[in-house]
């Protein structure tokens, strides 16, 4: 319930503030002031990941990746699906991270938390979780910023207001210019968390990390505050909430006029024929 989640958030925030090596993160700011990053065109990459390899992904994920690629091509972007066979082509990940992944001290989801910020730091571009459905009309320019995400604060309903993000961002859709300060600081934060905790303080470590940086560093606070509002909690999760409903063309058109990016889930216990989930899997949306 809301009260216990708020209390839990408070305890985790206190733990993170007390244990994070802030001087390591401050070094990123010193490096940043010494590095003149040339402002060029926004990097045209859409990054995502399926660790076991795309060919081994569930059907739904293969379909969402199909839509991500289609969207990327329309906008002149290259899609890169990171997996265990190609990661070394793009990143040098510290050995202790792999060792913790093998031991199971961190799972693939939290490993991918680190990977998205390393990619944005090194190359820039857009990160989308592999279960994201992107409608062709999604306004990509809201992500072509120094650092961006989906700010979904305009939702009037009170659900999930106990969430640490306070609707300022979503971890499954992030973007940034190459070398952006938020990704660099988050990379430093996550490496510190992975190295110095037997178990990460929370599954949603990205949200606690961004919240921590927001509180501690004015520069990051200002960047996050400048992310334009787009969509609502209800709309972003609409496809997941309605996955078993029978597809209705008028309803879908109404929904995609309001919002054009959706979090879906491949974890459906059964597929209802002609449902939204079924349409997504069959690439008929």
Model-derived features: where do they sit?
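Small-residue hinge/turn detector
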Residues: 113-123
């Amino acid at each position: 319930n809301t009260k216990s989640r708020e209390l839990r958030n408070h305890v985790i925030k206190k733990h993170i503030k007390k244990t994070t090596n802030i001087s390591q993160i401050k070094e990123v700011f010193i490096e940043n002031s010494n590095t003149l990053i040339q402002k060029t065109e926004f990097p045209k990459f859409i990054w995502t990941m399926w660790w076991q390899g795309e060919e081994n992904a569930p059907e739904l994920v293969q379909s969402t990746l199909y839509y991500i690629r289609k969207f990327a091509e329309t906008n002149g972007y290259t899609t890169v699906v990171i997996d265990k066979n190609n990661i070394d082509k793009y990143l040098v990940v510290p050995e202790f991270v792999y060792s913790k992944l093998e031991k199971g001290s961190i799972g693939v989801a939290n490993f991918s938390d680190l990977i998205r910020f390393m990619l944005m730091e090194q190359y820039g571009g857009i990160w989308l979780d592999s279960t994201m459905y992107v409608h062709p009309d999604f306004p990509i320019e809201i992500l072509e910023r120094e650092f961006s995400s989906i700010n979904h604060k305009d939702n009037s309903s009170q659900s999930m207001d106990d969430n640490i993000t306070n609707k300022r961002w979503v971890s499954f859709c992030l973007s940034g210019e190459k070398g952006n300060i938020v990704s660099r600081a988050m990379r430093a934060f996550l490496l510190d968390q992975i190295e110095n905790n037997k178990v990460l303080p929370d599954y949603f470590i990205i949200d606690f990390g961004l919240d921590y940086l927001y509180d501690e560093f004015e520069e990051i606070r200002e960047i996050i505050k400048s992310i334009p509002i787009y969509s609502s909690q209800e709309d972003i999760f609409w496809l997941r909430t309605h996955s078993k409903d029978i597809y209705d063309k008028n309803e879908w058109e109404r929904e995609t006029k309001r919002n054009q990016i959706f979090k879906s889930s491949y974890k459906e216990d059964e597929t209802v024929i002609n449902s939204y989930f079924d349409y997504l899997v069959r690439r008929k949306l």
